[in-house]
């Protein structure tokens, strides 16, 4: 009986927890316009760093306009409303990508963004159309758009390495949360305790 209970417990943990190791991503073609990101055109890192996430947001919105037109998607959403299916960390992710390799400026790149937690929940079955009737976070029109993007393979669920390696996230972007940094901190704390314990014991 104890073995059976253990099997049930492990099965429950796996069935409830495996979704955490998958996250929903959307792949967009982003034109990294030089005039927006490097006005002087000299690839000076200090100057490019002055472009905040607000400077990257219009590039993401523009990519949605291009996508909707290119794929003939049926939606009444503006590019601003459509881009809200992305995580609030999207502009920051794109900015970090550019700062790591300034040579991408002026190119059109294929970039994977996290969707927001509501879209992720919808594709994992936690969020339904019925449950969002009075929600300000997601609309039926956005879910219609998501369904079309899933059919096209533009939105997919993939292994969430960020969950294993990332740091904690704010309430505004829970989809970007991870426990990697916490694990490192816990490891060093245990190491310190172990060292102190050995010295005191000796």
Which residues fall in each region the model found?
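Glycine-rich, histidine-containing beta strand-loop boundary motifs that form or position
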Residues: 8, 25, 198
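Transmembrane alpha-helix signature in integral membrane proteins
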Residues: 179-202
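N-terminal signal-anchor/first transmembrane alpha helix
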Residues: 1-12
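Membrane-topology segments of multi-pass transport proteins
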Residues: 13-175
């Amino acid at each position: 009986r104890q073995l059976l209970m253990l099997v049930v417990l492990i099965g429950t943990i796996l069935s409830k927890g495996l979704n955490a190791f998958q996250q929903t991503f959307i792949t967009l073609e982003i034109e990294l316009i030089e005039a927006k990101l490097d006005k002087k055109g000299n690839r000076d890192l200090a100057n490019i760093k002055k472009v905040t996430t607000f400077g990257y947001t219009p590039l993401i919105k523009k990519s949605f306009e291009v996508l909707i037109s290119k794929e003939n998607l049926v939606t009444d959403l503006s590019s601003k409303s459509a881009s809200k299916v992305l995580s609030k960390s999207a502009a920051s992710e794109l900015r970090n990508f550019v700062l790591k390799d300034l040579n991408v400026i002026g190119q059109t790149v294929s970039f994977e963004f996290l969707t927001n937690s509501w879209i992720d929940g919808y594709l994992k079955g936690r969020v339904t159309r019925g449950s969002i009737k009075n929600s300000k976070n997601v609309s039926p029109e956005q879910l219609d758009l998501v369904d079309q993007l899933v059919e096209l393979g533009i939105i997919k669920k993939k292994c969430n390495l960020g969950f294993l390696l990332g740091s904690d996230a704010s309430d505004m972007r829970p989809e970007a949360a991870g426990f990697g940094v916490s694990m490192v901190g816990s490891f060093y704390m245990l190491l310190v305790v172990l060292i102190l314990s050995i010295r005191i014991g000796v």
